[in-house]
Structure formats: structure tokens, C-alpha cells
Amino acid sequence: MSWQAYVDDHLMCEIEGNHLSAAAIIGHNGSVWAQSATFPQLKPEEVTGIMNDFNEPGSLAPTGLYLGGTKYMVIQGEPGVVIRGKKGPGGVTVKKSTMALLIGIYDEPMTPGQCNMVVERLGDYLIEQGL
């Protein structure tokens, strides 16, 4: 299965009538493996900030999580495993696998829990596969 198929079929899938507004799978170095057409262009320093927070949990909290220049307030995640952010009625979930970052961006009517489930389920699967 191609990385694009993982994004299209497993991240941008419908859940309880809703779906993510954007999603991507990127390497730890910031290289884009696959993304939805709506995913924002990430800046290198944004990926560096995300990776730093996985290595030193809490480092993004004071400044916020930035994706494509959009700032998300960091909310409780799982230190070293999942970073969650909120912006108005929407937000983001970032799950770190062995080789990649899975990023899901959502907006109402999708809920934070639905976004977490979609992103983390695929992330857990990739971890089980050694990816």
C-alpha cells in the first residue's frame, strides 16, 4: 500500500459521518511522504519544534504548535507519543511512529476524540509494523 493510500483511506476516512479537514504522513526529518490536498505547507522549524517536543515533552506548550504558520494551543497529549493542539472549534493530533509523524487536522463537526482515534489508530498500526 502506498503512503498516499494510507492518508486517503485511513486518515481522511469517514468516522461517524465526519472526516479530517487535512492529514499527512511525514518523515522525522520533515520530508512529506503523503498528504491530503488541503494539508498546509510545513516550515522546517515547525517540524523541528514537533520533534523537539517528542524528545522533551512540554517544550511546545509555552510557544504553541505551529503547522503551516497556524498556531495551535498545546493541550494534554501523551508525552513522547502524541501531541494535541486546539484552535477555536478545531485542532490537531500528531502521533509519532518509529519512522514518521502522522498529522490530522480537524474542524467542527468532527470532535477531538474522533481525530485522536483516526490518527492514533493508524499510528499504532504503523508502530506494530516497525514503521
UniProtKB/Swiss-Prot annotation:
Q: Name one GO cellular component term.
A: cytoskeleton
Give TM segment ranges. none
Q: Which portions of this protein are annotated as coiled-coil regions?
A: none
Recorded hits in Gene3D superfamilies, A to Z, give: Dynein light chain 2a, cytoplasmic (3.30.450.30)
Xref: PROSITE patterns: PROFILIN
Alphabetical list of SUPFAM superfamilies matching this protein? Profilin (actin-binding protein) (SSF55770)
Q: What keywords were assigned to this record?
A: Actin-binding, Allergen, Cytoplasm, Cytoskeleton
InterPro entries, A to Z: PFN, PFN_euk, PFN_sf, Profilin_CS
Q: Where on the tree of life does the source sit, at the highest rank?
A: Eukaryota
Give the matching Pfam families: Profilin (PF00235)
Q: Which GO terms describe its molecular function?
A: actin monomer binding
Tell me the compartments it is located in: Cytoplasm, Cytoskeleton
Which SMART domains does the annotation name? PROF (SM00392)
What does this protein do, in the record's words?
Binds to actin and affects the structure of the cytoskeleton. At high concentrations, profilin prevents the polymerization of actin, whereas it enhances it at low concentrations. By binding to PIP2, it inhibits the formation of IP3 and DG.
Query: What protein family is recorded?
Result: Belongs to the profilin family.
Question: What binding partners and quaternary form does the record give?
Answer: Occurs in many kinds of cells as a complex with monomeric actin in a 1:1 ratio.
What is the name listed in the Swiss-Prot or TrEMBL entry for this protein?
A: Profilin-2
Q: What is the lineage of its organism?
A: Eukaryota, Viridiplantae, Streptophyta, Embryophyta, Tracheophyta
